[in-house]
Amino acid sequence: MKQILFPFEIDNPIYKEAYVYAVKFARNLNTQMILLNTFIITAGNDITKDKYSKLIRNKWFKAYNEVSKLNKYYLEEHARTDNQLIIKFDYRFINGTLKEEIKNVAREDAVGLIVLPVSDRKEMNKRQLEIIHDNLFEKNRVSLLVIPFKGVFKPINNIVFLTDLKKLHHFTQYLNNVIQCAEAFDSNIHFVNISSKESDVNQENSEVYQEIMKITNKNPRYVYERLIGNNVIESVNQYVENNNADLLVAIKHQHYFLETLFHKSITDEISLNSKVPVLIMREIED
């Protein structure tokens, strides 16, 4: 897998569990993590080079100190049950805005996954949604792992993969990606088709359905379910709860999340209100 990007802020507790998830994914998928912290230094025309360098060093020191606290939390709470696979860290402490630097790093580096926590602050969640919606990530096919507010890491034993069975570009690659994730975490997969009514999709005529059937026939830990319900959020949350899901996975369509039934507002609501982490993969543009 490509590198994992973990943007973080200073003295914000929502990043602790998000950091744990980022490290777990980096360890299990055997990839490097980029730790990104941004800051703004306002300097007048009369500032000297030495003073500016001192301001930069002070910001770097604070960022390194924050990383130390995140590592301490991880080691105290989670390292006992982890394998000791060493992962590499790439530190990026940059004078700039977080949103723009996330885009710059994703554009310039081989980033495959960005880990973002949900906050109880509306302005922060608004920024997170702007990141989720940005077309840069569609062009670069960067996936997003959204960690729920007050979420606590749990082993990923059950993955729920949402699908409307509509054929997307290169859909087999997404199926392979979720299988790769399941193998890395030794997880079960529930391929779940949620429809607003019984006649929405003719399963047998769907290439996606046929491909999923091939997958489930090869592995008894991978199953397919079909749910009928007008309230998408309620149906998803109920299924997640009933089946002890630890990760929710879905494809963001080029235009809308799972095109019609899973439209943009549903994307936002699932991302911000899910009780389990949501992995959003992007449809590849032709």
Predicted regions and their residues:
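Gly/Ser-rich helix-loop-strand patches that form or flank binding pockets
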Residues: 101-152, 242-243, 247-286
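A short helix-to-beta-strand connector/capping loop
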Residues: 78-90, 217-223
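Active-site phosphate/pyrophosphate- and oxyanion-stabilizing loops and adjacent acidic/basic residues
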Residues: 23, 134, 179, 237, ...
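General small-molecule cofactor/ligand-binding pocket signal
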Residues: 34-36, 90-94, 145, 190-192, ...
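Small/aliphatic-rich secondary-structure junction motif
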Residues: 1-54, 160-225, 245, 273, ...
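Charged docking surfaces used in two-component/phosphorelay signaling
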Residues: 88-101, 232-233
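A short, acidic, amphipathic alpha-helical segment used as a generic capping/interface helix at domain edges
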Residues: 210-213, 229-242
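A short acidic, glycine-rich active-site loop
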Residues: 53-69
